[in-house]
Amino acid sequence: MLKIADTTFHSRLFTGTGKFANANLMTQAIAASGSQLVTMAMKRIDLQSGNDAILAPLQKLGVKLLPNTSGAKTAEEALFAARLAREALATNWIKLEIHPDVKYLLPDPIETLKGAEMLVKDGFVVLPYCSADPVLCKRLEEVGCAAVMPLGAPIGSNQGLLTRDFLQIIIEQAQVPVVIDAGIGAPSHALEALELGADAVLVNTAIAVARNPVKMAQAFRIAIEAGELSYQAGRASPKQHAVASSPLTDFLRVL
């Protein structure tokens, strides 16, 4: 099980809500994934309606909602979005996203750290999307973030763990959960992240744009379970030379 702040999760697969063809397909895929934490952008929610097309189906699923500040370009804008989410959804959990670069959607490290400090002081449980920078992740941990969410690759790129070496350092140093966010494009990428020692992964695009999102969600669920088991089992270390599985030593001694 995974504990973040005051909440325990059985699933280490977190999911997003963007890019699905329709709300029904979204809820089917999320249910198939087994995910218990689902993120959504406040900018996409119709707060004036009592039956929002995204929010209402998620509430029926019974998952924990993690509103995010996607669209914010500064720490101040992120704080405004977070307060809006807290008021509208009655949650103090927030995924901090500040990425002013519209082409690559890379997080702004300076504004992210600043925003994290502001949000923590305002009573939020903060999960920041950030670069795979070990120093930044440690600083985010020190200011009180409940977890860190370093990227594997740019958002929606499906390139996997391009930042693998840095992720390994982050995982080794972290005293809070590490959730790999962005770039996870295949179940094998999620499995690799869990084998590396990550506490969880967040997947959206790879499931939402798959030919069959429900089956892809199931595949990710299985991959996450396999990755966790592999990490717990302790995989054999790679070697540069062959090591016989059945040595001839004892056999030759008998001869």
UniProtKB/Swiss-Prot annotation:
Subunit text: Homotetramer. Forms heterodimers with either ThiH or ThiS.
Function as written in the Swiss-Prot or TrEMBL entry: Catalyzes the rearrangement of 1-deoxy-D-xylulose 5-phosphate (DXP) to produce the thiazole phosphate moiety of thiamine. Sulfur is provided by the thiocarboxylate moiety of the carrier protein ThiS. In vitro, sulfur can be provided by H(2)S.
Record-listed 1-deoxy-D-xylulose 5-phosphate binding positions: 156, 182-183, 204-205
Species of origin: Photorhabdus laumondii subsp. laumondii (strain DSM 15139 / CIP 105565 / TT01)
Record Pfam families: ThiG (PF05690)
InterPro entries assigned: Aldolase_TIM, Thiazole_synthase_ThiG, ThiG
Catalytic activity: [ThiS sulfur-carrier protein]-C-terminal-Gly-aminoethanethioate + 2-iminoacetate + 1-deoxy-D-xylulose 5-phosphate = [ThiS sulfur-carrier protein]-C-terminal Gly-Gly + 2-[(2R,5Z)-2-carboxy-4-methylthiazol-5(2H)-ylidene]ethyl phosphate + 2 H2O + H(+)
EC number of the protein: 2.8.1.10
GO cellular component: cytoplasm
Keyword Cytoplasm annotated: yes
Gene expressing this chain: thiG
Gene Ontology terms: biological process: thiamine diphosphate biosynthetic process
Localization per record: Cytoplasm
Keywords of this entry: Cytoplasm, Schiff base, Thiamine biosynthesis, Transferase
Location of the active site: 95 (schiff-base intermediate with dxp)
Name this protein carries in UniProt: Thiazole synthase
Signal peptide coordinates: none
Taxonomic placement: Bacteria, Pseudomonadati, Pseudomonadota, Gammaproteobacteria, Enterobacterales
Entry GO MF terms: thiazole synthase activity
